Amino acid sequence: MGLLQEKLAKYDLPQKFMAQGVYPYFREIEGKQGTEVEMGGQHVLMFGSNAYTGLTGDERVIEAGIKAMRKYGSGCAGSRFLNGTLDLHVQLEKELAAFVGKDEALCFSTGFTVNSGVISCLTDRNDYIICDDRDHASIVDGRRLSFSQQLKYKHNDMADLEKQLQKCNPDSVKLIIVDGVFSMEGDLANLPEIVRLKHKYNATIMVDEAHGLGVFGKQGRGVCDHFGLTHEVDLIMGTFSKSLASIGGFIAADSSIINWLRHNARTYIFSASNTPAATAAALEALHIIQNEPERLNALWEATNYALRRFREAGFEIGATESPIIPLYVRDTEKTFMVTKLAFDEGVFINPVIPPACAPQDTLVRVALMATHTKEQIDSAVEKLVKAFKALDLL
């Protein structure tokens, strides 16, 4: 056994939880993802999906992907930089840019590679990147790959953000990067105050709308639109894997920024482009959410109903303002145990443990879709109450 294998063989945390019978990961889904799924031979309510609009199983989205595959084939066999650009990619980029209110957009193969590729090439050694300490891992990796000076501020603490900005050279680029909706806690960035500080310190703002697109704002245009601050935000990032029922991501900004990224973002230049099916599916989902406002209304009816039910049941749910509802456990082992008990009762939820959160903030994450019914929500709440009470968590 080599040194690397010897080192990695010591990592046995997954095996510990497997031995206890509470290991929650990599469960196989046997069919389409909707509000109910077949998983491991069991029929369960799905409250762990990011498909907020409920479009992953929509026949129109599926048919759009099939038609694109028939026309363009199964893949593009190259990067966007060379032979991998389809007219379909360009159409999606134009419509996304218009949707989020920016000059242009670029599509990437995944949301993760948007952040890791864009952030890493925007700044140099004399510049600064300032992040919320609960920003997504893709933002963390993007700033780590950059050569810039890196600062973090306490979660949604605007006084601490200002303190970090005061450390920066006033003549250097200062890029503030923030999740519009924080993916584990469900709360929103304090975008109005961030914009105020942007002007005070001549900074630039990038907002990750992964969990805001399709959820907030007019027609689901995102948190920036929700606050009426689209034109104050310099870069808007989004994904296709959530509300747009596909896989991929995009960055939208003014033409000068997009021109730079098109020729310098390594994850764009050196990755194969989005498949025709994925691109067409995202485009169709984008059309649907713009043309069916009742879908957004249904999402918020389900969300508000679930928030009320969980609060009434006595769960600690923090400051969430979104379809992401954290049920705090504050103990890693019990987080896995309550996830297992819930699954045995027929409810799939996601455990959140370090490094996705601080050790004292472990939780199970419930996520709502536009297609969830009150009956499904009531059933989930009832079963989660039972699971939490079994562990003396309620």
Swiss-Prot record:
Domain of life: Bacteria
Annotated binding of pyridoxal 5'-phosphate, by residue: G111, F112, S183, H211, T239
Role summary: Involved in de novo bacterial ceramide synthesis. Catalyzes the condensation of L-serine with palmitoyl-CoA (hexadecanoyl-CoA) to produce 3-oxosphinganine. Also capable of using alanine as substrate leading to the formation of 1-deoxysphinganine (1-deoxySa). Contributes to the levels of endogenous sphingolipids in its host.
Modified residues (N6-(pyridoxal phosphate)lysine): K242
One Gene Ontology term of the molecular function aspect: serine C-palmitoyltransferase activity
EC numbers on record: 2.3.1.50
Identification of the protein by name: Serine palmitoyltransferase
Family label: Belongs to the class-II pyridoxal-phosphate-dependent aminotransferase family.
Requisite cofactors: pyridoxal 5'-phosphate
GO biological process, one term: sphingolipid biosynthetic process
